[in-house]
Amino acid sequence: MASFSFFGTIPSSPTKASVFSLPVSVTTLPSFPRRRATRVSVSANSKKDQDRTASRRENPSTFSSKYAPNVPRSGADILVEALERQGVDVVFAYPGGASMEIHQALTRSNTIRNVLPRHEQGGIFAAEGYARSSGKPGICIATSGPGAMNLVSGLADALFDSVPLIAITGQVPRRMIGTMAFQETPVVEVTRTITKHNYLVMEVDDIPRIVREAFFLATSVRPGPVLIDVPKDVQQQFAIPNWEQPMRLPLYMSTMPKPPKVSHLEQILRLVSESKRPVLYVGGGCLNSSEELRRFVELTGIPVASTFMGLGSYPCDDEEFSLQMLGMHGTVYANYAVEYSDLLLAFGVRFDDRVTGKLEAFASRAKIVHIDIDSTEIGKNKTPHVSVCCDVQLALQGMNEVLENRRDVLDFGEWRCELNEQRLKFPLRYKTFGEEIPPQYAIQLLDELTDGKAIITTGVGQHQMWAAQFYRFKKPRQWLSSGGLGAMGFGLPAAMGAAIANPGAVVVDIDGDGSFIMNIQELATIRVENLPVKVLLINNQHLGMVLQWEDHFYAANRADSFLGDPANPEAVFPDMLLFAASCGIPAARVTRREDLREAIQTMLDTPGPFLLDVVCPHQDHVLPLIPSGGTFKDIIV
């Protein structure tokens, strides 16, 4: 008999589930009516769909208003129509006193669906999951005061990771601003440094222009979050909207990057032809240029190391050219390549401290070429020998064209063989503990059973790093994780947003028990919306990364890293199966390695949401590890 416990009924599935016996009685769970299908049909990797969406926005020939041209309507209705005109068809909005007018207007929309999160932070993380997986801006709405404050982590996360996001907040009426009125917070001031831009709407006539500007800012150049704060009396005020108002962004428009000069691209290619040990160091800025990057690698034969945010921009399973992830928890061979390279091609990256370690020692033998769309990133942390401020996609297209016309013979086979020797000498590996389940093995199995094609979200901690190491992403926008901010609680709501943006896709939240419980309330949203989100819970009853750092840097002195019940430390606490059951979601627990494959297959075969609680040992560490501020010579394997 399979030794994993199961709670909940498994709905009938067109795909035959693995047969197993239930060692516990089955709890009958309530059935929920199926919600209307999402209108979003954007594939995680479909540029054509994204282009169609972009062309649909602001197009009078395709947009039809339900209002006659000269009919006054409320500011809230103008706001909702402005969203419709931008192609928005789903928002994540939680109502409150200062935003109820907007919610009432949403009920009058024929095209926008609201997904009601159970917490505003869940809503903004869901909007991020939607945006990260589709490339379209995610939209979230919250009320004033505490509702707006609950968006702060999500705004900072979107800014760090360059995610296009529009956050709309209700505000107290204009006459009450600055009086410490009930549920008043100065959200514009609070979020000024964690948004790309923000607005306080003081005139109803400005709504069409502000919304248009917000979408342009959120999606152009380096994407990011924009906040629009709308006082309640502005929402209630009636006006005839002017949809032809021009944007007022003269300074921003004057700094837009220009196409790269051919002479600059030829200079880079001369450096490539002169080098013996070149390495591509690619980041999140390459997610929209995956095809061009692959072609560049075909033409040059240069090996590719990816940042945490760039995973999937080049296929991780291409063992001839992919070095997988570099940095603090990157592979030995990726970090070796950077250490001994003579040319570092840094495309769409920001030389983050988790990649570079000690800046002076990073790529110290190499000439550095930095291409990025954001001029403020060039030279900020590491001074390049050659830099080009432009869209990476345009730069790659230009270099590919030059290479195809020249037909130069570039041979870096000897260098790749040297790196392959490092791969064989220092592969990603992990310990086994008898019948216990290594978390890395669980992720490897998931990769195998999904053929590396699932959309993966994570929380933050050890499980996040293991997912980055052991799941082999094939395409961009498969990997959704809080990178720069490192916000726990991200995984579950992000999976919710990804499932809505990508109907039919397999979406799995690989989470840790610490991160998962921070937004566990979104299980209710997932069930009510009937979203097929799978949760692979790596449950070691600890804050694993904190415990690991305690072991390495604090003489293993334990300080609040245990999450279980001190009175009964051997028990699994809290019981995640009961949380799932309370929301009507099937769930199972697996404790033995030999049962894991069947358990994961059952999770994948079960229609709708499913939670698989994988009980793991807590003693393992994420390796390799380059300590913070360290160098390649300090790597722990």
From Swiss-Prot:
GO molecular function: acetolactate synthase activity; flavin adenine dinucleotide binding; magnesium ion binding; thiamine pyrophosphate binding
Name of the top EC class for this enzyme: transferase
Chain intervals for the UniProt region annotation (Thiamine pyrophosphate binding): 462-542
Transit peptide, residue positions per record: 1-73
Matching InterPro entries: Acetolactate_synth_lsu, AHAS_TPP, DHS-like_NAD/FAD-binding_dom, THDP-binding, Thiamin_PyroP_enz_cen_dom, Thiamin_PyroP_enz_TPP-bd_dom, TPP-bd_CS, TPP_enz
Record field: compositional bias (Basic and acidic residues): 46-59
Pathway(s) this gene product operates in, as recorded in its UniProt entry: Amino-acid biosynthesis; L-isoleucine biosynthesis; L-isoleucine from 2-oxobutanoate: step 1/4; Amino-acid biosynthesis; L-valine biosynthesis; L-valine from pyruvate: step 1/4
PROSITE patterns: TPP_ENZYMES
Gene3D superfamilies (UniProt xref): 3.40.50.970, TPP-binding domain
Catalytic activities: 2 pyruvate + H(+) = (2S)-2-acetolactate + CO2
Enzyme Commission identifier(s): 2.2.1.6
Localization (cell): Plastid, Chloroplast
Binding site for FAD: 222, 329-350, 372-391
Residues reported to bind Mg(2+): 513, 540
Cofactor(s) needed: Mg(2+); thiamine diphosphate
Binding site for thiamine diphosphate: 120
Pfam families (alphabetical): TPP_enzyme_C, TPP_enzyme_M, TPP_enzyme_N
GO biological process, one term: isoleucine biosynthetic process
GO cellular component: chloroplast
Family: Belongs to the TPP enzyme family.
Miscellaneous: Acetolactate synthase is the target enzyme for sulfonylurea and imidazolinone herbicides.
Protein name, entry field: Acetolactate synthase 2, chloroplastic
Biological source species: Brassica napus (Rape)
Source species taxonomy: Eukaryota, Viridiplantae, Streptophyta, Embryophyta, Tracheophyta
